[in-house]
C-alpha cells in the first residue's frame, strides 16, 4: 500500500496514546476518562482501524494529559490488551501494557442499592476483578456489563 493511501494523524506533543483498544470501545474509554469533548483536551479517536495484531482496533490520543494508575486500572477492565504510550516532546517516552488488577478500590460504585457503599456510609468501594467481571467486596454483587456507568465521579 502506498503512503498516499494512509490517512495521517498528527503526532501529539505531550500526553497519552491508548492503543490496541478492542474495536468499537473507544467511546467507552472516553467515558471512563470523563472526557466528553467539552474540555480543552485535544483528543483524536480512531475506530475500527486496521491492525496486524488484532485485525481491527481503536486508538485514542489525548494531548496534555497523562493517565493516573486508577484510570489505567479501570481501563484494563474493558481493554485488557491495551498499550499506554506516554508521549513527551513528540516522542514515546514510556510504553507499557495495561495489567488487570486483582482489586479496584474507590473508583467504581456498586449498582446494588442495598450495598453499604451505595448509602451515605464512609466506606470506600472495592471490587475483586474476575475473569468475566467484578464482584463487590461488601455485597458480592457481580458486575460484568456497562462498567463505565459505575465510575464514581468523586
From Swiss-Prot:
Residues binding Zn(2+): 110, 115, 136, 139
**Membrane-crossing residues?**
none
Give the required cofactors: Zn(2+)
Q: Does the keyword Zinc apply?
A: yes
Query: Which Gene Ontology molecular function entries are recorded, alphabetically?
Result: metal ion binding
The record, for Pfam families, names: PyrI, PyrI_C
Q: Which GO terms describe its cellular component?
A: aspartate carbamoyltransferase complex
For this protein, the record's InterPro entries field holds: Asp_carbamoyltransf_reg_N, Asp_carbamoylTrfase_reg, Asp_carbamoyltrfase_reg_C, Asp_carbatrfase_reg_C_sf, Asp_carbatrfase_reg_N_sf
**Cofactor binding, per record:** Binds 1 zinc ion per subunit.
Keyword Metal-binding in the entry? The reply is yes
| Example GO biological process | pyrimidine nucleotide biosynthetic process
Cystine connections: none
Keywords from the named record: Metal-binding, Plasmid, Pyrimidine biosynthesis, Zinc
Q: What does this protein do?
A: Involved in allosteric regulation of aspartate carbamoyltransferase.
Family affiliation:
Belongs to the PyrI family.
* Complex and partners: Contains catalytic and regulatory chains.
Q: What is this protein called?
A: Aspartate carbamoyltransferase regulatory chain
Q: Which organism is it from?
A: Halobacterium salinarum (strain ATCC 700922 / JCM 11081 / NRC-1) (Halobacterium halobium)
